[in-house]
């Protein structure tokens, strides 16, 4: 958490150095929090410090190093491959998500504010795999669900846009949704990177080769990443609350 605060401070410095662009993009993204172009611009302008950490975490991991070396891209061809996968696979779920939301990988906004080519790729990779993360954790594209995804990205990457997205989206949330933020922060913490012995291993999402799992069972992805989908977490919380109150989990 302290590291994330450091990356947020670095993001503030980055914003100050590109103040006009930052203010313009932030204003537009608050007005329209699902506007991909402006959210992307804010993310890049505030990302430099966090991107350095993301690169280091990838360099210290075998899969991460391979991703940096080969620089795979998520394209419409990736989606075509996923759409041919049978039900039960991660690829099928991903293709269904993309079809329902009328998304195409090639429609992703290209990185425009990061000069270093390696860091630019790291940012591009993060952007292109965003929909994989949506699919993995079971979130759609409402403002509230985007916040959930951004919080997990923030815990894994330190990118300030995660917290900025929460702050900027508050005017669009109901009181109940705002109260739910405590649960979402807890869920993101449960799913934070973890390599402690004897505990569930959760790799940095930057070190997950998502494309490898497209033709694999969805459950294999969850097992290998250690990530608990948001609906599973909420059901677990509901069950624990019921037990604490002396109730049956099924409410009977």
From Swiss-Prot:
The keyword Methyltransferase does not apply. It comes from the Eukaryota. Keywords: Lyase, Membrane, Metal-binding, Mitochondrion, Mitochondrion inner membrane, Ubiquinone biosynthesis, Zinc. Its cofactor is Zn(2+). Zn(2+) binds at residues 130-131, 134, 146. GO terms for cellular component: extrinsic component of mitochondrial inner membrane. Its EC number is 4.1.1.130. Lyase that catalyzes the C1-decarboxylation of 4-hydroxy-3-methoxy-5-(all-trans-polyprenyl)benzoic acid into 2-methoxy-6-(all-trans-polyprenyl)phenol during ubiquinone biosynthesis. Component of a multi-subunit COQ enzyme complex. This is Ubiquinone biosynthesis protein COQ4 homolog 1, mitochondrial.
């Amino acid at each position: 958490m302290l590291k994330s605060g450091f990356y947020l401070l670095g993001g503030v410095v980055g914003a100050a150095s590109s103040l006009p662009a930052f203010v313009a993009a932030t204003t537009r993204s608050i007005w329209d929090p699902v506007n991909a172009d402006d959210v992307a611009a804010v993310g890049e302008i505030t990302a430099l410090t966090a991107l350095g950490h993301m690169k280091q975490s990838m360099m210290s991991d075998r899969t991460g190093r391979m991703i940096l070396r080969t620089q795979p891209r998520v394209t419409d061809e990736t989606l075509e491959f996923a759409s041919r996968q049978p039900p039960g696979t991660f690829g099928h779920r991903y293709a269904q998500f993309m079809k329902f939301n009328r998304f195409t990988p090639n429609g992703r906004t290209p990185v425009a504010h990061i000069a270093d080519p390696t860091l630019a790729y790291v940012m591009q990779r993060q952007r292109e795999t965003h929909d994989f993360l949506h699919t993995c954790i079971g979130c759609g594209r409402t403002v509230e669900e985007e916040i959930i995804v951004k919080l997990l990205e923030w815990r894994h990457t330190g990118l300030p846009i995660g917290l900025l997205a929460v702050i900027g989206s508050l005017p669009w949330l109901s009181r109940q949704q705002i109260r739910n933020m405590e649960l979402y922060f807890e869920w993101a913490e449960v799913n934070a990177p973890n390599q402690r012995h004897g505990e569930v291993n959760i790799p940095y999402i930057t070190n997950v080769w998502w494309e490898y799992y497209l033709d694999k069972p969805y459950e294999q992805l969850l097992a290998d990443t250690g990530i608990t989908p948001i609906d599973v977490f909420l059901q677990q919380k509901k069950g624990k609350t019921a037990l604490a109150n002396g109730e049956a989990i099924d409410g009977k």
